[in-house]
Amino acid sequence: MADKETMKNAIVADLTRIVIWKNMHKNSTDQSEKILLQAINLKSILHRSITGVLDSKNDYEGPAFLELKKLMSYLFAEKPGTGEKKEKDAETDALLHIAQYLRGSEWKKLTVDPANDNILPSQVKENPKKQPAKRKRSTSRPANEKPSAPENKQQEKGDIPDEDKQEQPVKKIRKNSTSAVDGKRKSQAERLAHIKELIEEGDNSKAIAQSHVYLGIKPDELKKLFLVKANTCSICHKPSKKLLNKGCCLFSVNICKKCIGDYMENLHSYMVAKKMGIKPIHCWACSTVQKYEDFIEDDNMFYKRFWYFLLVNGKIALPQTNKDKLRPVVDWLLACDKIDEEDKDKIRLYLPKSAAARKKARSTSTVIEKNVESETKQEETETITPKPAEDETPPMKEEVIEMKPPTPPEPVIKEEEEKVSEEPEIPPIKEIEDKVEPMVEDTPEEDKVAESMADFEPIDFSTMLDEDEKPQVNYYGSPIGHVSDDDDEIKEVAGGNAVQEADTESMDDFMDYFN
Protein backbone atom coordinates (compact mmCIF):
# COMPACT_ATOMS: atom_id res chain seq x y z
CA MET A 1 0.00 0.00 0.00
CA ALA A 2 2.82 2.37 0.76
CA ASP A 3 4.27 1.92 -2.72
CA LYS A 4 0.97 2.82 -4.36
CA GLU A 5 0.63 5.96 -2.27
CA THR A 6 4.11 7.12 -3.18
CA MET A 7 3.43 6.49 -6.84
CA LYS A 8 0.18 8.45 -6.65
CA ASN A 9 2.02 11.36 -5.06
CA ALA A 10 4.59 11.22 -7.84
CA ILE A 11 1.83 11.45 -10.45
CA VAL A 12 0.32 14.43 -8.66
CA ALA A 13 3.71 16.15 -8.52
CA ASP A 14 4.22 15.69 -12.25
CA LEU A 15 0.79 17.09 -13.01
CA THR A 16 1.40 20.17 -10.88
CA ARG A 17 4.67 20.83 -12.68
CA ILE A 18 2.91 20.64 -16.02
CA VAL A 19 0.30 23.13 -14.81
CA ILE A 20 3.04 25.51 -13.66
CA TRP A 21 4.90 25.23 -16.92
CA LYS A 22 1.75 25.98 -18.93
CA ASN A 23 0.91 29.09 -16.94
CA MET A 24 4.46 30.39 -16.98
CA HIS A 25 4.77 30.24 -20.76
CA LYS A 26 1.39 31.50 -21.93
CA ASN A 27 2.91 34.49 -23.71
CA SER A 28 6.09 32.82 -24.93
CA THR A 29 6.54 32.45 -28.67
CA ASP A 30 8.89 29.48 -28.68
CA GLN A 31 6.82 26.52 -27.47
CA SER A 32 9.37 23.83 -28.27
CA GLU A 33 10.80 23.64 -24.76
CA LYS A 34 7.34 23.41 -23.28
CA ILE A 35 6.30 20.58 -25.59
CA LEU A 36 9.43 18.58 -24.94
CA LEU A 37 9.04 18.78 -21.18
CA GLN A 38 5.36 17.91 -21.36
CA ALA A 39 6.20 14.86 -23.43
CA ILE A 40 8.71 13.67 -20.86
CA ASN A 41 6.33 14.23 -17.95
CA LEU A 42 3.53 12.52 -19.83
CA LYS A 43 5.71 9.49 -20.40
CA SER A 44 6.60 9.28 -16.71
CA ILE A 45 2.91 9.48 -15.80
CA LEU A 46 2.09 6.74 -18.25
CA HIS A 47 4.84 4.47 -16.98
CA ARG A 48 3.64 4.91 -13.43
CA SER A 49 0.04 4.21 -14.38
CA ILE A 50 1.10 1.09 -16.24
CA THR A 51 3.03 -0.25 -13.23
CA GLY A 52 -0.21 -0.56 -11.30
CA VAL A 53 -0.92 2.73 -9.61
CA LEU A 54 -4.44 3.07 -11.02
CA ASP A 55 -5.47 -0.58 -10.76
CA SER A 56 -8.67 -0.34 -8.70
CA LYS A 57 -11.95 1.47 -9.24
CA ASN A 58 -11.47 3.70 -6.22
CA ASP A 59 -8.27 5.06 -7.70
CA TYR A 60 -10.22 6.58 -10.59
CA GLU A 61 -11.96 9.04 -8.27
CA GLY A 62 -8.94 10.80 -6.77
CA PRO A 63 -7.52 14.21 -7.67
CA ALA A 64 -4.67 12.66 -9.64
CA PHE A 65 -7.12 10.90 -11.92
CA LEU A 66 -9.19 14.06 -12.45
CA GLU A 67 -6.12 16.07 -13.39
CA LEU A 68 -4.95 13.30 -15.68
CA LYS A 69 -8.36 13.37 -17.30
CA LYS A 70 -8.12 17.12 -17.94
CA LEU A 71 -4.58 16.75 -19.23
CA MET A 72 -5.58 14.05 -21.72
CA SER A 73 -8.52 16.10 -22.94
CA TYR A 74 -6.06 18.95 -23.56
CA LEU A 75 -3.63 16.65 -25.32
CA PHE A 76 -6.31 15.27 -27.63
CA ALA A 77 -7.31 18.80 -28.63
CA GLU A 78 -10.97 18.51 -27.68
CA LYS A 79 -13.24 20.88 -25.84
CA PRO A 80 -14.42 19.41 -22.53
CA GLY A 81 -17.92 18.00 -22.61
CA THR A 82 -18.64 18.72 -26.28
CA GLY A 83 -16.28 16.46 -28.17
CA GLU A 84 -15.66 19.21 -30.73
CA LYS A 85 -12.13 19.61 -31.91
CA LYS A 86 -10.30 22.86 -31.31
CA GLU A 87 -8.65 24.86 -34.01
CA LYS A 88 -5.44 23.23 -35.08
CA ASP A 89 -2.13 24.87 -34.46
CA ALA A 90 1.42 23.71 -34.05
CA GLU A 91 1.08 23.13 -30.33
CA THR A 92 -2.11 21.07 -30.42
CA ASP A 93 -0.91 19.05 -33.39
CA ALA A 94 2.31 18.21 -31.61
CA LEU A 95 0.51 17.25 -28.43
CA LEU A 96 -1.95 15.15 -30.38
CA HIS A 97 0.93 13.46 -32.15
CA ILE A 98 2.64 12.70 -28.83
CA ALA A 99 -0.55 11.40 -27.24
CA GLN A 100 -1.36 9.14 -30.19
CA TYR A 101 2.19 7.81 -30.20
CA LEU A 102 2.04 7.03 -26.50
CA ARG A 103 -1.47 5.65 -26.66
CA GLY A 104 -0.56 3.20 -29.39
CA SER A 105 2.57 1.86 -27.70
CA GLU A 106 2.34 2.27 -23.95
CA TRP A 107 -1.15 3.43 -22.95
CA LYS A 108 -2.62 0.13 -21.79
CA LYS A 109 -4.61 0.73 -18.64
CA LEU A 110 -6.39 3.99 -19.48
CA THR A 111 -8.16 5.03 -22.65
CA VAL A 112 -9.94 8.20 -23.67
CA ASP A 113 -13.54 8.38 -24.83
CA PRO A 114 -13.51 11.49 -27.08
CA ALA A 115 -17.31 11.84 -27.17
CA ASN A 116 -17.82 12.01 -23.41
CA ASP A 117 -14.34 13.27 -22.56
CA ASN A 118 -13.93 10.50 -20.02
CA ILE A 119 -11.05 8.20 -19.23
CA LEU A 120 -12.21 4.66 -18.57
CA PRO A 121 -10.38 1.45 -17.66
CA SER A 122 -9.98 -0.76 -20.70
CA GLN A 123 -9.41 -4.47 -20.88
CA VAL A 124 -8.23 -4.24 -24.49
CA LYS A 125 -4.54 -3.49 -24.86
CA GLU A 126 -4.42 -2.78 -28.59
CA ASN A 127 -6.54 -0.70 -30.93
CA PRO A 128 -9.98 -2.25 -31.64
CA LYS A 129 -9.51 -1.90 -35.40
CA LYS A 130 -6.49 -4.21 -35.48
CA GLN A 131 -7.96 -6.94 -33.29
CA PRO A 132 -10.82 -8.11 -35.54
CA ALA A 133 -8.38 -8.43 -38.45
CA LYS A 134 -6.11 -10.64 -36.37
CA ARG A 135 -9.05 -12.72 -35.19
CA LYS A 136 -10.22 -13.29 -38.77
CA ARG A 137 -6.79 -14.50 -39.74
CA SER A 138 -6.69 -16.82 -36.75
CA THR A 139 -10.12 -18.28 -37.63
CA SER A 140 -9.19 -18.76 -41.30
CA ARG A 141 -5.92 -20.56 -40.58
CA PRO A 142 -7.17 -23.70 -38.77
CA ALA A 143 -8.97 -24.95 -41.93
CA ASN A 144 -6.92 -27.32 -44.06
CA GLU A 145 -7.99 -26.10 -47.49
CA LYS A 146 -8.00 -22.33 -46.90
CA PRO A 147 -4.35 -21.79 -45.94
CA SER A 148 -3.07 -23.54 -49.06
CA ALA A 149 -4.86 -21.18 -51.44
CA PRO A 150 -3.65 -17.94 -49.89
CA GLU A 151 -0.14 -19.33 -49.60
CA ASN A 152 -0.12 -20.05 -53.32
CA LYS A 153 -1.48 -16.60 -54.03
CA GLN A 154 1.18 -15.07 -51.89
CA GLN A 155 3.84 -17.10 -53.60
CA GLU A 156 2.57 -15.98 -56.99
CA LYS A 157 2.36 -12.35 -55.95
CA GLY A 158 5.00 -12.49 -53.26
CA ASP A 159 7.49 -10.14 -54.88
CA ILE A 160 5.19 -7.12 -55.00
CA PRO A 161 3.88 -7.13 -51.41
CA ASP A 162 7.35 -7.81 -50.05
CA GLU A 163 8.73 -4.76 -51.81
CA ASP A 164 5.76 -2.70 -50.67
CA LYS A 165 6.26 -3.83 -47.12
CA GLN A 166 9.90 -2.84 -47.25
CA GLU A 167 9.23 0.57 -48.76
CA GLN A 168 6.23 1.57 -46.64
CA PRO A 169 7.86 1.59 -43.20
CA VAL A 170 10.83 3.58 -44.50
CA LYS A 171 8.51 6.21 -45.93
CA LYS A 172 6.54 6.39 -42.68
CA ILE A 173 9.65 6.86 -40.64
CA ARG A 174 10.92 9.59 -42.94
CA LYS A 175 7.61 11.43 -42.81
CA ASN A 176 6.93 11.16 -39.10
CA SER A 177 10.39 11.13 -37.56
CA THR A 178 14.08 11.49 -38.22
CA SER A 179 15.09 8.43 -36.23
CA ALA A 180 16.15 6.49 -39.34
CA VAL A 181 17.99 7.39 -42.49
CA ASP A 182 18.49 4.77 -45.21
CA GLY A 183 17.11 2.14 -42.86
CA LYS A 184 19.66 2.89 -40.10
CA ARG A 185 18.73 4.31 -36.73
CA LYS A 186 20.41 7.47 -35.50
CA SER A 187 22.17 7.71 -32.21
CA GLN A 188 20.84 9.90 -29.43
CA ALA A 189 23.54 12.48 -30.02
CA GLU A 190 22.58 12.74 -33.69
CA ARG A 191 18.90 13.12 -32.79
CA LEU A 192 19.67 15.84 -30.29
CA ALA A 193 21.86 17.68 -32.78
CA HIS A 194 19.21 17.46 -35.50
CA ILE A 195 16.40 18.83 -33.34
CA LYS A 196 18.67 21.51 -31.95
CA GLU A 197 19.37 22.64 -35.51
CA LEU A 198 15.64 22.77 -36.25
CA ILE A 199 15.03 24.97 -33.21
CA GLU A 200 17.91 27.29 -34.05
CA GLU A 201 16.67 27.63 -37.63
CA GLY A 202 13.19 28.50 -36.40
CA ASP A 203 11.40 25.37 -37.64
CA ASN A 204 9.59 24.88 -34.37
CA SER A 205 6.78 22.85 -35.92
CA LYS A 206 9.24 20.24 -37.22
CA ALA A 207 11.09 20.20 -33.92
CA ILE A 208 7.83 19.73 -32.06
CA ALA A 209 6.78 16.94 -34.40
CA GLN A 210 10.00 15.10 -33.58
CA SER A 211 9.56 15.46 -29.82
CA HIS A 212 8.65 11.81 -29.41
CA VAL A 213 12.33 11.06 -30.05
CA TYR A 214 13.03 12.49 -26.60
CA LEU A 215 10.74 10.10 -24.77
CA GLY A 216 13.65 7.85 -23.93
CA ILE A 217 16.04 10.61 -22.89
CA LYS A 218 16.56 11.82 -19.34
CA PRO A 219 15.39 15.33 -18.42
CA ASP A 220 18.94 16.32 -17.43
CA GLU A 221 20.05 16.07 -21.04
CA LEU A 222 17.21 18.34 -22.10
CA LYS A 223 18.23 20.90 -19.53
CA LYS A 224 21.69 21.17 -21.02
CA LEU A 225 20.47 21.49 -24.60
CA PHE A 226 17.33 23.60 -24.54
CA LEU A 227 16.30 25.00 -21.20
CA VAL A 228 19.44 26.43 -19.64
CA LYS A 229 21.27 28.60 -22.16
CA ALA A 230 24.39 30.53 -21.25
CA ASN A 231 23.94 34.29 -20.80
CA THR A 232 20.25 34.23 -21.80
CA CYS A 233 17.14 34.67 -19.71
CA SER A 234 14.77 31.70 -19.83
CA ILE A 235 11.73 34.00 -19.77
CA CYS A 236 12.50 36.97 -22.03
CA HIS A 237 15.23 35.12 -24.02
CA LYS A 238 17.47 38.19 -23.95
CA PRO A 239 21.19 38.11 -23.27
CA SER A 240 22.22 39.37 -19.86
CA LYS A 241 25.39 39.02 -17.84
CA LYS A 242 23.80 38.92 -14.37
CA LEU A 243 21.50 35.92 -14.05
CA LEU A 244 20.02 33.90 -11.21
CA ASN A 245 20.36 30.19 -11.96
CA LYS A 246 17.88 28.18 -9.91
CA GLY A 247 17.21 24.46 -10.21
CA CYS A 248 14.10 22.38 -9.65
CA CYS A 249 12.97 18.78 -9.75
CA LEU A 250 11.75 19.49 -13.28
CA PHE A 251 13.75 22.34 -14.77
CA SER A 252 16.47 24.89 -14.17
CA VAL A 253 15.88 28.54 -14.91
CA ASN A 254 18.13 31.51 -15.63
CA ILE A 255 16.30 34.63 -14.44
CA CYS A 256 17.32 38.20 -15.13
CA LYS A 257 16.52 40.96 -12.67
CA LYS A 258 13.89 42.51 -14.89
CA CYS A 259 11.84 39.32 -15.22
CA ILE A 260 12.02 38.07 -11.67
CA GLY A 261 8.92 40.01 -10.62
CA ASP A 262 6.82 38.57 -13.42
CA TYR A 263 8.31 35.17 -12.75
CA MET A 264 7.18 35.27 -9.13
CA GLU A 265 3.68 36.32 -10.13
CA ASN A 266 3.46 33.39 -12.52
CA LEU A 267 4.49 31.03 -9.77
CA HIS A 268 1.18 31.81 -8.06
CA SER A 269 -0.25 29.21 -10.42
CA TYR A 270 1.24 26.72 -7.99
CA MET A 271 -1.64 27.57 -5.69
CA VAL A 272 -4.16 26.89 -8.43
CA ALA A 273 -3.19 23.25 -8.30
CA LYS A 274 -3.61 23.27 -4.54
CA LYS A 275 -7.12 24.70 -4.80
CA MET A 276 -7.97 21.90 -7.22
CA GLY A 277 -7.23 19.36 -4.50
CA ILE A 278 -3.57 18.66 -5.24
CA LYS A 279 -1.12 18.75 -2.36
CA PRO A 280 2.26 20.16 -3.40
CA ILE A 281 4.98 17.64 -2.67
CA HIS A 282 8.06 18.87 -4.51
CA CYS A 283 9.16 22.24 -5.69
CA TRP A 284 12.48 23.76 -6.57
CA ALA A 285 12.91 24.79 -2.93
CA CYS A 286 12.40 21.21 -1.80
CA SER A 287 14.35 21.52 1.42
CA THR A 288 12.26 24.42 2.70
CA VAL A 289 8.98 22.77 1.81
CA GLN A 290 9.91 19.61 3.64
CA LYS A 291 11.32 21.46 6.63
CA TYR A 292 8.50 23.98 6.98
CA GLU A 293 5.42 22.20 5.64
CA ASP A 294 2.81 23.98 7.74
CA PHE A 295 4.08 27.55 7.56
CA ILE A 296 1.46 29.18 5.45
CA GLU A 297 -2.11 28.37 4.47
CA ASP A 298 -2.95 31.41 2.39
CA ASP A 299 -2.56 32.03 -1.33
CA ASN A 300 0.97 33.43 -0.98
CA MET A 301 2.43 30.21 0.39
CA PHE A 302 4.80 29.37 -2.42
CA TYR A 303 5.70 33.02 -2.89
CA LYS A 304 6.84 33.35 0.72
CA ARG A 305 8.61 30.02 0.74
CA PHE A 306 10.46 31.04 -2.38
CA TRP A 307 11.72 34.27 -0.83
CA TYR A 308 12.50 32.50 2.41
CA PHE A 309 14.70 30.03 0.54
CA LEU A 310 16.54 32.79 -1.30
CA LEU A 311 16.98 35.03 1.72
CA VAL A 312 18.30 32.37 4.05
CA ASN A 313 20.75 30.97 1.52
CA GLY A 314 21.81 34.47 0.43
CA LYS A 315 21.80 33.57 -3.26
CA ILE A 316 19.93 36.55 -4.66
CA ALA A 317 20.62 40.21 -5.38
CA LEU A 318 17.34 41.99 -4.81
CA PRO A 319 16.17 44.25 -7.64
CA GLN A 320 14.65 47.64 -6.95
CA THR A 321 11.23 46.62 -8.30
CA ASN A 322 10.62 43.90 -5.73
CA LYS A 323 11.60 45.79 -2.59
CA ASP A 324 8.02 46.82 -1.88
CA LYS A 325 6.73 43.29 -2.45
CA LEU A 326 9.45 41.76 -0.34
CA ARG A 327 9.02 43.96 2.75
CA PRO A 328 5.68 42.47 3.94
CA VAL A 329 6.98 38.98 3.26
CA VAL A 330 10.07 39.63 5.37
CA ASP A 331 7.93 41.09 8.14
CA TRP A 332 5.74 38.00 8.06
CA LEU A 333 8.74 35.65 8.13
CA LEU A 334 10.22 37.49 11.12
CA ALA A 335 6.91 37.23 12.96
CA CYS A 336 6.59 33.49 12.29
CA ASP A 337 7.30 31.37 15.37
CA LYS A 338 8.36 28.27 13.44
CA ILE A 339 11.41 29.87 11.84
CA ASP A 340 14.72 29.50 13.61
CA GLU A 341 16.35 32.58 15.10
CA GLU A 342 19.49 32.02 13.06
CA ASP A 343 17.45 32.19 9.88
CA LYS A 344 15.74 35.34 11.12
CA ASP A 345 19.11 36.97 11.65
CA LYS A 346 19.96 36.27 8.02
CA ILE A 347 16.61 37.62 6.86
CA ARG A 348 17.02 40.87 8.82
CA LEU A 349 19.96 41.81 6.62
CA TYR A 350 17.53 42.32 3.73
CA LEU A 351 15.28 44.80 5.50
CA PRO A 352 17.23 47.94 4.35
CA LYS A 353 16.37 49.03 0.84
CA SER A 354 19.87 49.52 -0.52
CA ALA A 355 23.31 48.02 -0.18
CA ALA A 356 24.62 51.26 1.35
CA ALA A 357 21.91 51.09 3.97
CA ARG A 358 22.90 47.51 4.71
CA LYS A 359 26.51 48.58 5.22
CA LYS A 360 25.37 51.42 7.45
CA ALA A 361 23.18 49.04 9.39
CA ARG A 362 26.05 46.65 9.89
CA SER A 363 28.46 49.47 10.84
CA THR A 364 25.92 51.05 13.19
CA SER A 365 25.27 47.69 14.76
CA THR A 366 28.99 47.25 15.44
CA VAL A 367 29.29 50.83 16.74
CA ILE A 368 26.29 50.31 18.98
CA GLU A 369 27.80 47.12 20.32
CA LYS A 370 31.09 48.92 21.05
CA ASN A 371 29.26 51.78 22.75
CA VAL A 372 27.26 49.34 24.82
CA GLU A 373 30.43 47.56 25.86
CA SER A 374 32.13 50.86 26.80
CA GLU A 375 29.08 51.97 28.77
CA THR A 376 28.97 48.71 30.66
CA LYS A 377 32.67 49.03 31.48
CA GLN A 378 32.15 52.59 32.73
CA GLU A 379 29.25 51.49 34.90
CA GLU A 380 31.36 48.73 36.39
CA THR A 381 34.19 51.16 37.20
CA GLU A 382 31.75 53.61 38.74
CA THR A 383 30.24 50.94 40.95
CA ILE A 384 33.69 49.82 42.07
CA THR A 385 35.11 53.31 43.02
CA PRO A 386 32.33 55.53 44.36
CA LYS A 387 33.66 55.89 47.97
CA PRO A 388 37.27 57.00 47.35
CA ALA A 389 35.99 59.71 45.04
CA GLU A 390 35.68 62.05 48.10
CA ASP A 391 39.46 62.44 48.56
CA GLU A 392 41.73 62.77 45.57
CA THR A 393 45.24 61.95 46.84
CA PRO A 394 44.62 59.56 49.78
CA PRO A 395 42.71 56.99 47.78
CA MET A 396 45.85 56.20 45.77
CA LYS A 397 47.81 55.71 49.01
CA GLU A 398 45.02 53.62 50.45
CA GLU A 399 45.06 51.49 47.34
CA VAL A 400 48.80 51.01 47.72
CA ILE A 401 48.29 50.13 51.37
CA GLU A 402 45.52 47.77 50.43
CA MET A 403 47.81 46.01 47.99
CA LYS A 404 50.21 45.11 50.85
CA PRO A 405 47.78 43.22 53.08
CA PRO A 406 47.11 40.56 50.46
CA THR A 407 50.78 39.50 50.83
CA PRO A 408 50.56 38.58 54.57
CA PRO A 409 47.56 36.28 54.08
CA GLU A 410 49.83 34.05 51.97
CA PRO A 411 51.93 32.95 54.96
CA VAL A 412 48.72 32.63 56.95
CA ILE A 413 47.51 30.19 54.34
CA LYS A 414 50.80 28.34 54.63
CA GLU A 415 50.40 28.14 58.42
CA GLU A 416 46.93 26.73 57.97
CA GLU A 417 48.31 24.23 55.47
CA GLU A 418 51.04 23.30 57.94
CA LYS A 419 48.45 22.78 60.64
CA VAL A 420 46.47 20.65 58.33
CA SER A 421 49.61 18.70 57.42
CA GLU A 422 50.42 18.23 61.13
CA GLU A 423 46.98 16.99 62.07
CA PRO A 424 46.07 14.72 59.18
CA GLU A 425 46.71 11.51 61.07
CA ILE A 426 43.94 11.60 63.69
CA PRO A 427 40.90 13.14 61.92
CA PRO A 428 41.15 11.11 58.73
CA ILE A 429 40.81 7.92 60.77
CA LYS A 430 37.32 8.89 61.78
CA GLU A 431 36.56 9.96 58.27
CA ILE A 432 37.88 6.66 56.98
CA GLU A 433 35.78 4.79 59.50
CA ASP A 434 32.75 6.76 58.39
CA LYS A 435 33.57 5.97 54.80
CA VAL A 436 34.22 2.30 55.50
CA GLU A 437 30.77 1.76 56.94
CA PRO A 438 28.87 2.28 53.69
CA MET A 439 31.42 0.08 51.89
CA VAL A 440 30.11 -2.89 53.90
CA GLU A 441 26.91 -2.60 51.92
CA ASP A 442 28.68 -4.11 48.90
CA THR A 443 28.64 -7.57 50.47
CA PRO A 444 24.99 -8.28 49.69
CA GLU A 445 25.72 -7.49 46.05
CA GLU A 446 28.45 -10.16 46.07
CA ASP A 447 25.99 -12.56 47.62
CA LYS A 448 23.57 -11.74 44.84
CA VAL A 449 26.28 -12.44 42.28
CA ALA A 450 27.08 -15.74 43.97
CA GLU A 451 23.43 -16.67 44.04
CA SER A 452 23.06 -15.80 40.40
CA MET A 453 26.16 -17.86 39.53
CA ALA A 454 24.78 -20.78 41.51
CA ASP A 455 21.88 -20.99 39.10
CA PHE A 456 24.18 -22.00 36.24
CA GLU A 457 24.51 -25.71 35.57
CA PRO A 458 27.99 -27.22 35.17
CA ILE A 459 29.13 -27.61 31.59
CA ASP A 460 29.89 -31.12 30.44
CA PHE A 461 32.94 -30.66 28.24
CA SER A 462 32.97 -34.33 27.39
CA THR A 463 30.24 -33.74 24.86
CA MET A 464 32.52 -31.36 22.97
CA LEU A 465 35.34 -33.89 22.36
CA ASP A 466 35.70 -37.32 20.82
CA GLU A 467 36.41 -40.34 22.99
CA ASP A 468 40.02 -40.48 21.86
CA GLU A 469 40.65 -36.84 22.69
CA LYS A 470 39.12 -36.84 26.18
CA PRO A 471 41.77 -36.28 28.92
CA GLN A 472 40.78 -38.39 31.89
CA VAL A 473 42.80 -36.62 34.60
CA ASN A 474 43.87 -33.01 35.09
CA TYR A 475 47.01 -31.67 36.78
CA TYR A 476 45.60 -32.27 40.28
CA GLY A 477 44.49 -35.81 39.52
CA SER A 478 40.78 -35.02 39.36
CA PRO A 479 38.68 -36.20 36.40
CA ILE A 480 37.91 -33.59 33.70
CA GLY A 481 34.39 -33.16 32.46
CA HIS A 482 33.02 -35.62 34.98
CA VAL A 483 31.45 -35.10 38.40
CA SER A 484 31.05 -38.16 40.58
CA ASP A 485 27.84 -38.80 42.40
CA ASP A 486 29.53 -39.81 45.66
CA ASP A 487 29.99 -37.02 48.15
CA ASP A 488 33.22 -38.53 49.49
CA GLU A 489 34.96 -38.30 46.14
CA ILE A 490 33.80 -34.74 45.71
CA LYS A 491 35.18 -33.82 49.12
CA GLU A 492 38.53 -35.41 48.30
CA VAL A 493 38.75 -33.53 45.05
CA ALA A 494 37.75 -30.27 46.71
CA GLY A 495 39.96 -30.73 49.76
CA GLY A 496 43.68 -30.25 50.24
CA ASN A 497 44.45 -33.99 50.33
CA ALA A 498 43.82 -34.23 46.62
CA VAL A 499 46.96 -32.27 45.89
CA GLN A 500 49.15 -34.56 48.00
CA GLU A 501 47.68 -37.68 46.43
CA ALA A 502 48.32 -36.25 43.01
CA ASP A 503 51.97 -35.66 43.89
CA THR A 504 52.54 -39.23 45.18
CA GLU A 505 50.28 -41.59 43.30
CA SER A 506 48.63 -40.17 40.20
CA MET A 507 51.46 -38.10 38.72
CA ASP A 508 53.13 -41.19 37.24
CA ASP A 509 49.95 -42.17 35.48
CA PHE A 510 49.47 -38.58 34.35
CA MET A 511 52.94 -38.38 32.81
CA ASP A 512 52.53 -41.79 31.20
CA TYR A 513 49.39 -40.48 29.55
CA PHE A 514 51.32 -37.75 27.74
CA ASN A 515 54.33 -39.95 26.97
Curated annotation (Swiss-Prot):
Signal peptide span: none
Source taxon at top rank: Viruses
Region span, Disordered: 117-188, 362-453, 496-515
Extent of Acidic residues compositional bias: 502-515
Feature: compositional bias, Basic and acidic residues: 370-380, 388-402, 428-438
Name the UniProt record assigns to this protein: Uncharacterized protein ORF53
